[in-house]
Design a protein with these regions (language model features):
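Short, Lys/Arg-rich flexible segments
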Residues: 1-186
Length: 186
């Protein structure tokens, strides 16, 4: 005669099911999570301006052209790059909602700084006078207009996320999921 051993295990999965239901409910509207992720991206952009460095690589932005820097100094400006009047830095905006988080700007010249490139060729004409006048090499010049072939602008990326930002985002997502599972998020 062979003896049979029968083991029966009953598991109460109601707590697991309830936790998964809470997580599912929290994921129906991820706006609170996306708001936190947009804040991380916004802080990354703020640091890029403060450090004058690429937020993705950490590399310092290329220095200003010495001639351009001298012209700025003549007008009294000796401040930070990309912040002559503050328009670009103060027009960085966050957008977020269910399933998306983004940081950007609608400033027209932002793209040339973010990606680098060559500005459009154009004519320069006087605003309030009949002619332009300047001195160069001890010689005087007067012209009604001059053609500018465009300027090469180096990339000075200010939008983006680096390794630390990505880690912060991953931790934020994990904390959001953990809080939802534990019933601390609605």
């Amino acid at each position: 005669m062979i003896a049979m051993l029968k083991i029966e295990v009953n598991l109460d999965t109601s707590e697991v099911k309830a936790a998964l239901d809470r997580l599912t409910h929290a994921m129906r509207d991820t706006t609170p999570l996306m708001m936190e992720l947009a804040q991380i991206m916004s802080e990354s952009t703020d640091r890029a301006f403060e450090n004058e460095a690429d937020p993705v690589t950490g590399a310092k932005w290329p220095k200003l052209n010495p001639n351009y820097k001298a012209r700025l100094a003549e007008t009294g400006y000796t401040g930070s790059m990309l912040q002559r009047d503050g328009t670009l830095k103060t027009n960085i905006h966050q957008e977020y909602g269910h399933g998306y988080a983004r940081v950007g700007t609608n400033v027209t010249y932002a793209a040339i700084h973010q990606f680098g490139g060559i500005t459009r060729a154009h004519w320069i004409r006087p605003k309030d006078k009949k002619a332009l006048a300047w001195r160069k090499g001890g010689k005087s010049y007067v012209r009604r207009a001059v053609f500018h072939p465009g300027s090469e602008i180096p990339r000075r990326r200010f939008l983006g996320v680096g390794p630390q930002d990505k880690q912060d985002m991953e931790e934020t997502i994990a904390a959001y999921a953990r809080e939802a599972l534990m019933g601390k998020r609605r």
